[in-house]
From Swiss-Prot:
Keyword Membrane attributed: yes
Keywords: Cell inner membrane, Cell membrane, Membrane
Taxonomic lineage of the native organism: Bacteria, Pseudomonadati, Pseudomonadota, Gammaproteobacteria, Cellvibrionales
Organism: Saccharophagus degradans (strain 2-40 / ATCC 43961 / DSM 17024)
Superkingdom, taxonomy of origin: Bacteria
Main function: Could be involved in insertion of integral membrane proteins into the membrane.
Listed name of the protein: Putative membrane protein insertion efficiency factor
Family, per entry: Belongs to the UPF0161 family.
Membrane topology: Peripheral membrane protein
Length: 91
């Protein structure tokens, strides 16, 4: 198979399918977004929001490091932290 075909297949593959442990974690984020977050209202002090950050961290870094990054971010999301722009670190 040519190199160009392999590259295009890699680019189009869904990153969550590569690691099945991400699926239940991403499902929990969706439950939070659609069931809990609307009841609480907009409270996140960060950009991207904590749920978006957690989703991106899981996809980019996998379930273990992604969870640690998400928990670290959630520990900063309180009234005594300034918040601001805090993107997911690159691999």
């Amino acid at each position: 198979m040519e190199a160009c075909c392999k590259k295009s297949r890699k680019a189009n593959s869904d990153p969550t399918r590569k690691n099945w442990l991400n699926l239940p974690l991403l499902a929990l984020i969706k439950v939070y977004r659609y069931a809990i977050s609307p009841l609480l209202g907009p409270r996140c002090r960060f950009e991207p929001t904590c749920s978006s950050y957690a989703e991106q961290a899981l996809i980019e870094h996998g379930p273990f490091k992604g969870t640690m990054l998400a928990l670290s971010r959630l520990s900063k999301c309180h009234p005594w932290h300034a918040g601001g722009y805090d993107p997911v670190p690159k691999k």
